[in-house]
């Protein structure tokens, strides 16, 4: 218990005091991320720059990273009646199928919980998502399954050409897709950045290699952080 209280004090000391702090786009650069190091043998906790990770590990240790690349999962569309909406993909495409959540008119500058409801749609409706013609296959509240006129590589190309990164109202400017990728991103599988690996920059990875630390990869999806609806958030993968 004494050790736990000490750990809490160290982490709590890093929190800004007073009112809520508005984060800026560059609030913490990848090189400025800090790492909480817990030493159970000495019952100590310290905070160090993340770049010191290679010195904390030993030759033969293994670091496993998630190599899922972040999709441009935010796409804007219209109904046949001209009503506008945003589609946020909730999973990678499968053939010609797109899985996602609809938000009403607006963009990331408005908090998700303050966005208007999306247009009403029904199975069989034809929509236009960016440049992609789709038909509604399933509807469950704001969750939808859409079938596109394109499939596989052609559909991926259109999504990458028209989509942007999902982001939220605490930032004012649109993020480029490269800004939400890890250094080792490979398979397009995450609808938001797998941010635990954000600070694993190339210099840290090279430092791990030089220290004899092994690096292995797996691909694991990262889902939507928020839809503005708590019940829907809990239902998403």
Model-identified regions with their sequence ranges:
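A cross-family signal for N-terminal binding/gating loops and helix N-caps
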Residues: 1-237
